[in-house]
């Protein structure tokens, strides 16, 4: 009887051990299968090309030029909407979960980018296209000359409605004299809100840096197509270098270096080619100039003999037309590349060069 009980116990133990071994084997097999499935999924993803999402039309154009047939590139911003003020929808967020790369401009353009970083899948990568670019301060008032004395005209108490000393080169304002928190110095006007100018793409040199950042990210995410990405980048750089040379040659002959523009989007272009932008509106083109600012722009144009005012596609040109009528200037259209176009980045910049060349000769 005792022997029978022992035999039953041994059999039960053997059965339990066998079940446990089978469960462990199944678990190991499942783990291996999941790993293989994940690897296969990744391989298939690369074979089908990278899934790339961008925040602007410019980053889309650069990414598409580098990816070629090795990737699908989608811009979040819908047709007919500009880069300023865009916010991604829940549908956009779902699309980002499936993206291999999300490429954004940076420089403060996309205030919502941190939310996207939390949304991306674990295999996705977020790329700041403007990384490594020296950013310009934004929010400068129109009468500031880039690299020159901030104020060229005299301020006095007779022609300004200020309660403080009207010397424009001596902004010694205390808190007691103002009811706002803006800091003032000899380089910045009271309309400077301390941000950075996000329009980095308006410099062809910056576009090359952006393209390099994008290519590096593609190679990291898809090393199997490294040769393709590098070859496409080299071809793109040739075109960008040629474009840069065209700008230098044409604008070196400009008789005037001042450009009155709809909003403060041309600082990087101006810096590269020795121009000075006089913006009617600020960085995001959402505010209109007050009567005093309008008067200053008109006076500056008359003093310097500026013959053109540059408007923008998709934007109301009423204020620019008013300034033009007051000064006898002509109106031409310059594109800050903030809305979608049938043309790519290089073609749009070539069009801008033709406009500038004809106006500044």
Stretch-by-stretch model annotation:
Residues 2-9, 15-361:
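Extracytoplasmic metal-acquisition and chelation regions
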């Amino acid at each position: 009887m005792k022997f029978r009980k022992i035999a039953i116990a041994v059999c039960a133990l053997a059965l339990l051990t066998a079940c446990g071994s089978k469960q462990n084997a199944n678990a190991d097999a499942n783990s291996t299968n999941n790993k293989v499935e994940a690897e296969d999924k990744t391989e298939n993803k690369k074979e089908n090309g990278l899934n790339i999402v961008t925040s602007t039309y410019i980053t889309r154009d650069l990414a598409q030029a580098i990816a070629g047939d090795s990737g699908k590139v989608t811009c979040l911003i819908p047709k007919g909407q500009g880069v300023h003020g865009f916010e991604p929808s829940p549908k956009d967020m779902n699309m980002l979960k499936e993206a291999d790369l999300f490429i954004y401009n940076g420089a403060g353009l996309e205030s919502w980018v941190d939310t996207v970083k939390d949304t991306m899948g674990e295999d996705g990568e977020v790329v700041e296209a403007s990384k490594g670019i020296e950013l310009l301060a934004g929010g400068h008032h129109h009468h500031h000359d880039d690299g020159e004395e901030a104020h060229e005209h005299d301020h006095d108490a007779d022609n300004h409605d200020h309660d403080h000393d009207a010397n424009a080169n001596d902004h010694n304002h205390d808190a007691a004299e103002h009811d706002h928190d803006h800091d003032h110095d000899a380089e910045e006007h009271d309309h400077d809100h301390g941000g950075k100018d996000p329009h980095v793409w308006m410099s062809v040199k910056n576009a090359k840096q952006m393209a390099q950042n994008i290519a590096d990210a593609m190679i990291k995410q898809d090393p199997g197509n490294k040769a393709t990405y590098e070859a496409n980048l080299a071809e793109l750089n040739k075109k960008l270098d040629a474009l840069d040379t065209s700008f230098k040659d044409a604008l070196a002959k400009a008789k005037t270096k001042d450009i009155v523009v709809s909003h403060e989007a041309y600082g990087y272009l101006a810096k590269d080619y020795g121009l000075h932008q006089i913006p009617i509106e600020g960085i995001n083109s959402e505010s209109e100039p007050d009567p005093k600012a309008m008067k200053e722009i008109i006076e500056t144009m008359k003093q310097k003999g500026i013959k053109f005012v540059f408007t923008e596609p998709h934007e109301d040109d009423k204020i620019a037309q008013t300034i033009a009528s007051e000064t006898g200037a002509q109106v031409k259209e310059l594109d800050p590349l903030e809305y979608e176009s049938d043309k790519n980045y290089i073609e749009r910049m070539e069009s801008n060069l033709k406009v500038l060349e004809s106006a500044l000769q």
